[in-house]
């Protein structure tokens, strides 16, 4: 039986040079009979896991690749599929299969940004790299990334966030770990609270986006809300090397338009049915039975319906609001495909974060969840308190106390694993991303209970003021709080000091292994899983802040771990890199509290002091942007 390094070496080549495959495929008579149901989506077409037919074919291919009993049979079948199915569809379905097959445990996927660099790097930059490689084929090539806009567009101030390679890769990877059409019966593996996680992960991205807007002197975003409104323009500056066509730009002033597969009124109807559901406090399943939207399962049920996923209780009635919204926005310039143009970046999980409309659309989706949350009772002091524990003080340790500096840091991306430049030498691009200085938390806690307490430490960060400089009221601020960390801590009687480094955050991914590292045999730990590689990029943990220093509030809360842990005790999570966003391997989601607790429900208070219990703390911190590293 092949070892993990041997399997890694066999799988890597299947991801290389996918942008250079030809459209010609072998005759169907020569295909493995198990591939009979795939190959419908033409090669050279942009694959979208939001599109119902694309996702259906990808699910068929995944099941074909998941079924072989031996690794060798799986690998041979994947090699055959690679040359007959759509390039993007293959990368998606093959990735889902690799990270879920038991015999691929320990195998690490190469970074999607190296597999399809054309989804992450502006076409002007790739064009420059091609010229340099042609002119100097005997040397390694390094080019600088080209700008995609200018100050005439206010949104360009946020290009560093929207176009961040790690953030876009995270979004692609999350949808690979949590496929919309996941079949728990077929695989025997359940994705616990998948619908609620869909809601929470995207809510957090919207909160982070608004924090970045405030950091750049912009107002908070205006949610999408009207299916007939004229939308802002956007130009992605990306060209698909699979099709040779640009990702569609969107001129300002266009509205959503009917597609050949679906009309705008269908999506409006789905929205209305979902809104009716939470007002009535129940949804209708396929047999027309009422399913109650209770506090424990309501968000999970709604998440499956809104996305929609295979867990939807009634997809035929509630439709697929989120997914078709992505498709409609991506095809606004060519809704009926009469011009045979590529869709826009909203069609692809690895590119959609680049478009400002992504955040407005997801804030619209999040508002539906918030309407449901408003039907639940607000948390009381008894719900929030942890008797016997009192937070004495909280401090952020960096070069200056309670002040963290951010900056732009240069990084490099290898293009030549995904693109054929006609040279054996390496071709790289240099780009900048936001980063921050190392920092840690010191939390002093008094345990007056006389016994050992197991606590869940929850750390959030939110802006203190709005765009006008007014202090945010708690009900506004709660939707802007971003989760920084959540971890278990044992607290003895008396005074305890908790020290926690920011690099230990459970929302960020520790390391992304490159093609070269994987080829050299650098592997993740043996107990690593797909969940270890899923997570928000570490360098984007905190917002940019301002040159003068922007005021934020650090919220720390202690809750009872013996109640929070679904195992009921101090159980170990096998893979704990980014459990808040990505869950845990073969276990229940490792926190019984609602995701985002205690900020998931509206509150009627006007000041934080009205609800702060002894086990909570609010500390003013400053984030200062200092430019390039």
From Swiss-Prot:
Indicate the principal place this protein occupies in or around the cell: secreted
* Residues bound to Cu cation 2: 322, 326, 362
Query: SUPFAM superfamilies from the entry?
Result: Di-copper centre-containing domain, E set domains, Hemocyanin, N-terminal domain
| Tissues expressing this chain | Hemolymph.
- Which residues does Cu cation 1 bind? 171, 175, 202
Q: Where found?
A: Secreted, Extracellular space
Q: Which UniProt keywords apply?
A: Copper, Disulfide bond, Glycoprotein, Metal-binding, Oxygen transport, Secreted, Transport
Q: Tell me its family.
A: Belongs to the tyrosinase family. Hemocyanin subfamily.
Q: What is this protein called?
A: Hemocyanin G chain
Q: Which organism is it from?
A: Aphonopelma sp. (American tarantula)
């Amino acid at each position: 039986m092949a070892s993990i390094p041997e399997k890694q070496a066999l799988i890597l080549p299947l991801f290389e040079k996918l942008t250079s495959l030809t459209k010609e495929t072998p005759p169907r008579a020569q295909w493995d009979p198990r591939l009979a149901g795939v190959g419908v989506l033409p090669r050279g077409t942009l694959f979208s896991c939001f599109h119902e037919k694309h996702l259906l074919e990808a699910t068929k291919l995944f099941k074909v690749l998941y079924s072989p009993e031996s690794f060798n049979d799986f690998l041979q079948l994947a090699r055959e599929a690679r040359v007959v199915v759509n390039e993007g569809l293959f990368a998606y379905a093959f990735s889902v299969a690799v990270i879920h097959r038991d015999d691929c445990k320990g195998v690490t996927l190469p970074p999607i940004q190296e597999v399809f660099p054309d989804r992450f790097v502006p076409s002007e930059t790739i064009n420059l790299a091609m010229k340099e490689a042609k002119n100097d084929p005997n040397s390694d090539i390094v080019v600088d990334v080209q700008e995609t806009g200018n100050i005439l567009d206010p949104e360009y101030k946020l290009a560093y966030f929207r176009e961040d390679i790690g953030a876009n890769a995270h979004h692609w990877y999350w949808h690979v770990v949590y496929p919309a059409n996941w079949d728990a019966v077929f695989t025997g593996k359940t994705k616990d609270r998948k619908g609620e996680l869909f809601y929470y992960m995207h809510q957090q991205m919207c909160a982070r986006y608004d924090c970045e807007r405030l950091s750049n002197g912009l107002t908070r975003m205006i949610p999408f809300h009207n299916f007939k409104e004229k939308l802002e323009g956007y130009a992605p500056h990306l060209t698909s090397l699979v099709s040779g066509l640009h990702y569609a730009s969107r001129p300002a002033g266009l509205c959503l338009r009917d597609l050949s597969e679906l009309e705008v009124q269908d999506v409006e109807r789905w929205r209305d049915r979902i809104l009716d559901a939470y007002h009535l406090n129940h949804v209708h399943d396929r047999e027309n039975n009422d399913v109650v939207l209770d506090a424990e399962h309501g968000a999970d049920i709604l998440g499956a319906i809104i996305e929609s996923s295979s867990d939807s209780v009634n997809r035929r009635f509630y439709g697929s609001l989120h997914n078709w919204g992505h498709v409609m926005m991506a095809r606004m310039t060519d809704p009926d495909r009469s011009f045979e143009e590529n869709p826009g970046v909203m069609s692809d999980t690895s590119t959609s974060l680049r478009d400002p409309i992504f955040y407005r659309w997801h804030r619209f989706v999040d508002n539906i969840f918030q309407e449901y949350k408003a039907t639940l009772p607000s948390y009381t002091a008894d719900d929030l308190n942890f008797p016997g524990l009192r937070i004495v003080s909280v401090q952020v340790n960096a070069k200056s106390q309670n002040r963290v500096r951010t900056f732009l840091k240069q990084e490099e991306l290898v293009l030549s694993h995904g693109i054929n430049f006609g040279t054996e030498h390496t071709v790289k691009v240099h780009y900048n991303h936001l980063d921050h200085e190392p920092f840690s938390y010191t939390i002093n806690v008094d345990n007056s209970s006389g016994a050992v307490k197991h606590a869940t430490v929850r750390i959030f960060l939110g802006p203190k003021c709005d765009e006008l400089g007014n202090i945010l009221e708690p009900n506004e601020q709660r939707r802007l709080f971003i989760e920084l960390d959540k971890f278990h801590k044992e607290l003895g009687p008396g005074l305890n000091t908790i020290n926690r480094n920011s690099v230990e955050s459970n929302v960020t991914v520790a390391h992304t292994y490159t093609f070269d590292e994987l080829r050299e045999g650098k592997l993740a730990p043996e107990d690593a899983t797909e969940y270890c590689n899923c997570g928000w990029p570490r360098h984007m943990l905190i917002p940019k802040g301002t040159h003068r220093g922007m005021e934020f509030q650090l919220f720390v809360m202690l809750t009872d771990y013996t109640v929070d842990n679904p195992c009921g005790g101090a159980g170990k999570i096998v893979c704990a890199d980014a459990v808040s966003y990505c869950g845990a391997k073969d276990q229940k989601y490792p926190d019984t509290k609602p995701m985002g607790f205690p900020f998931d429900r509206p509150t009627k208070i006007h000041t934080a002091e009205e609800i702060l219990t002894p086990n909570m703390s609010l500390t003013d911190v400053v984030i200062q942007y200092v430019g390039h590293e």
